[in-house]
Amino acid sequence: MSLQAIKYFDNQLQIIDQLQLPFVTEYIPIRSAQDGWYAIKEMRVRGAPAIAIVAILSLAVELNEIHTAGKLSSSSEEVGLFIIEKLHYLVTSRPTAVNLADAARKFENMVTEHTRAQDSTGQSLVAAYLKEAELMLVHDLSDNQNIGEYGAKWILERAATQGQNKVNVLTHCNTGSLATAGYGTALGVIRSLHAKNALNRVYCTETRPYNQGARLTAYELVHEKMPATLITDSMAASLLAKSHSKVSAIVVGADRVAANGDTANKIGTYALAVLAKYHGVKFLVAAPRTTIDRGTLTGTEIVIEERAPSEVTTIKGPLQGRVGDTLQMETIQLAATGIDVWNPAFDVTPAALIDAVITEKGVVEKGSDGFFHFDALFEESASS
């Protein structure tokens, strides 16, 4: 059974504190938009789909609390301004991930339309917000399952031409239940392969410097008893070169996909794409349509978040043999004191290195002109 990283029931929100994984599984309450902002900024929750969901639901919890306490204004205009201000605030917690900004924009549009209605009140606006927020959680899970099915089918069809009915895949960072409402994007593809008894082995990178692969992806893979091997980031080239491993595909997630297919994802993704091209391994991006930013023409326009030098120069964890219900984390220095550090959280993989983008509506490959064209994915949304 997949992990449930986000629990939302009866207007209460809890998330797994990912800073304590894989040593302790603890759910922490999110009671306000401010709680949501800090949970995202401090990376207690991460993954582009998950942070958008937590942001929107954190405000839902706060709105419900205000309403329950009898402090909600009857004016839809006043409540609308409050919601929009909070949405803008939440977007500042993680600027690179397009899902958060996209969700905030959609909810802002919903608020604006609702306040224009003649019978609109503060109470009806909050009710509409809560309904849409809950649907967002449901839709994300369904979308991830579709991504998994489409991606597994695409990989297996190509493996079959090589006489393979089981495949080895490599993934980077964490794109599973801990990064989404459930199931996952890139890890969802791997889950689907495993469910079809078509996964021979998944290799996951440790994903320095924040170690999401070692801490989170490995945690999910062990939890679900998948055949898995952890490697350091710098071992990927040797793995792809080994004939015994025969990696069929590298599958990664995305924080933002530009209109031309350039993809911003966890630092180290670009390097894997270069290695895949050299070794003739398919390189796939798995992401919902909400991650595709048609307003950003190329990857050069994507703002890359830079994080604290301490993430590179130190490492955190409990001392070996001292893991219990109460986690006592230690910080260990790795680097020479005084060394300068550059710590971009993401890099941008050029579309030329990407073989396909897997979405909940299907797999998009490059056209005959050598470019990605995503417009057809959104035609249904525009007409519905």
UniProtKB/Swiss-Prot annotation:
Annotated site location: Transition state stabilizer: C173
Keywords, sorted A to Z: Amino-acid biosynthesis, Cytoplasm, Isomerase, Methionine biosynthesis, Nucleus
MF GO annotations: S-methyl-5-thioribose-1-phosphate isomerase activity
One biological process term in Gene Ontology: L-methionine salvage from methylthioadenosine
Domain of life, source organism: Eukaryota
Keyword Nucleus listed: yes
Catalytic activity: 5-(methylsulfanyl)-alpha-D-ribose 1-phosphate = 5-(methylsulfanyl)-D-ribulose 1-phosphate
Record pathway: Amino-acid biosynthesis; L-methionine biosynthesis via salvage pathway; L-methionine from S-methyl-5-thio-alpha-D-ribose 1-phosphate: step 1/6
Subcellular location: Cytoplasm; Nucleus
Disulfide bonds: none
Top class in the EC scheme: isomerase
InterPro entries: IF-2B-related, IF-M1Pi, IF_2B-like_C, Initiation_fac_2B_a/b/d, M1Pi_N, NagB/RpiA_transferase-like
GO cellular component labels: cytoplasm; nucleus
Catalytic residue list: D255
Assigned EC number: 5.3.1.23
Family: Belongs to the eIF-2B alpha/beta/delta subunits family. MtnA subfamily.
Function field: Catalyzes the interconversion of methylthioribose-1-phosphate (MTR-1-P) into methylthioribulose-1-phosphate (MTRu-1-P).
NCBIfam families: eIF-2B_rel (TIGR00524), PRK05720.1 (NF004326), salvage_mtnA (TIGR00512)
Protein name, entry field: Methylthioribose-1-phosphate isomerase
Organism (species): Talaromyces stipitatus (strain ATCC 10500 / CBS 375.48 / QM 6759 / NRRL 1006) (Penicillium stipitatum)
Gene of this entry: mri1
